[in-house]
Curated annotation (Swiss-Prot):
Any matching Pfam family: MFS_1
Regions of this protein lying in the Periplasmic compartment: 1-17, 74-90, 166, 248-256, 302-304, 365-366
Keyword set includes Cell inner membrane: yes
Entry similarity comment: Belongs to the major facilitator superfamily. LplT (TC 2.A.1.42) family.
GO MF annotations, alphabetized: lysophospholipid:sodium symporter activity
Source organism per UniProt: Escherichia coli O17:K52:H18 (strain UMN026 / ExPEC)
Record protein name field: Lysophospholipid transporter LplT
Length: 397
């Protein structure tokens, strides 16, 4: 089938439903597998310092394969690329189940995730366009956040019952995602017949980076989404240290519940963005980005649980409203210049590099003994200033 056959179809077409279901199951597996594998490391008496390595190998796969996965997504039908990527995740989860080194298995899942991301976002621009694309991004983000919430809880609960059951559930989720991918229409490849020389692919990826950076709109989107997701991961780790200091609560559950409030808020914000923001009015999302930093600053000063819950949900709402239009803008403009797959691959490189950089700065701040509350205040202030500077930069260019 040609690509044009499916363009501008209903937001709830068979293909779109299959994409959303596959995304939910795949993201559910990703989040459940993290907690299940952490439980496995504890059960097998791995040292505590080894636990962050799981996140590092996962993010590292995104960065390492960034020059190649965009071309993969654009050279084949994106639904089939998604199916192959989920198959890699299934293989990684199954290998952990069968006793293969968990770091190797999790690395394979990371490779699958790296290949999956450009295809899952790129296909939205092939199934729908224009104002529907923002709404489709909202559905994608909402399904992802729902999967994060349910997957994280399921991974932890099942691991407390039996680690092997938790790992098997993750493999089952990936298997379900593979099946869902079968129902995605086989669209024409966006850019077939490209060279598979690794040097040329790397050069082509760097050219895509340059092309997107030179375009004011895509540069604006890349910087904005990278700042957001880098800050989001840092906030997750900040909460782990902040809760016992600010609230005097030492259990492991409270930081998880607080993180869940952010995720719920993102769903609400994504829905609001789908209704209130179009590709022509993307700048409407910028005040929300600035307010994220302001609310993080206020949150860092709290000492009561209920205001903390409310402020974190507000951070999530602002975050969803901020990031969904930027994603849609990059997909639409990137599809026309370097291909949607390459655009998302460049975005992944930026976001994951920002994650590593921000986490590194945060870890250094903790290492030198800066108290967590001042870290939170500084983090919020710097984020607000960074988004304000980005907005001013975008308006001038």
């Amino acid at each position: 089938m040609s690509e044009s056959v499916h363009t501008n179809t209903s937001l709830w077409s068979k293909g779109m439903k299959a994409v959303i279901v596959a995304q939910f199951l795949s993201a559910f597996g990703d989040n459940a597998l993290l907690f299940a594998t952490l439980a496995l490391l504890k059960a097998q008496f791995y040292p505590e310092w080894s636990q962050p390595i799981l996140q590092m190998v996962f993010v590292g796969a995104y960065i390492l394969f960034a020059p190649f996965v965009g071309q993969v997504a654009d050279s084949f039908a994106k639904g089939r690329v998604m199916m192959f990527a989920n198959g890699l995740k299934l293989l990684g989860a199954a290998s952990i189940c069968f006793g293969i080194n968990p770091f190797l298995g999790y690395t394979l899942v990371g490779v699958g995730a790296a290949a999956y991301s450009p295809a899952k976002y790129g296909i939205l621009g092939e199934l729908t366009t224009g104002s529907k694309l923002v709404k489709a991004n909202g559905l994608m983000e909402a399904s992802t956040i729902a999967a994060i919430l349910l997957g994280s809880v399921a991974g932890g609960v099942l691991a407390d019952w039996h680690v092997l059951v938790a790992l098997a559930a993750c493999a089952l989720a990936y298997g379900g995602a593979v099946v869902a991918n079968i129902y995605i229409p086989k669209l024409a490849a966006a850019r077939p017949g490209q060279s598979w020389n690794l040097i040329n692919m790397t050069r082509s990826f760097l050219n895509a980076c340059t092309s997107l950076w030179r375009n004011g709109e895509t540069r604006f989107s890349l910087v904005g989404t990278s700042l957001f997701w880098g800050a989001g991961v840092t906030l997750r780790f900040l909460l782990v240290l902040w809760v016992p200091v600010a609230l005097g609560i030492t259990d492991n559950a409270t930081p998880t519940y607080l993180n869940a409030m952010v995720a719920i808020g993102i769903v609400v914000g994504a829905g609001a963005a789908a209704k209130l923001v179009t590709l022509e009015t993307v700048s409407r999302c910028m005040p929300a980005g600035i307010l994220i930093g302001v609310v993080v600053l206020i949150f860092s000063l709290q000492h009561e649980l209920l205001p903390a819950y409310a402020l974190l949900m507000l951070i999530g709402v602002l975050g969803g409203f901020f990031v969904v239009p930027l994603n849609a803008l990059l997909q639409e403009r990137g599809k026309k210049s370097v291909g949607a797959g390459n655009a998302i691959a460049v975005q992944n490189l930026g976001e994951n590099s920002a994650m590593l950089l921000m986490l590194g700065i945060y870890s250094l701040a903790v290492m030198v003994g800066i108290p967590v509350v001042p870290i939170g205040i500084g983090f919020g202030a710097l984020f607000a200033l960074a988004i304000a500077a980005l907005w001013i930069w975008q308006r001038r260019h």
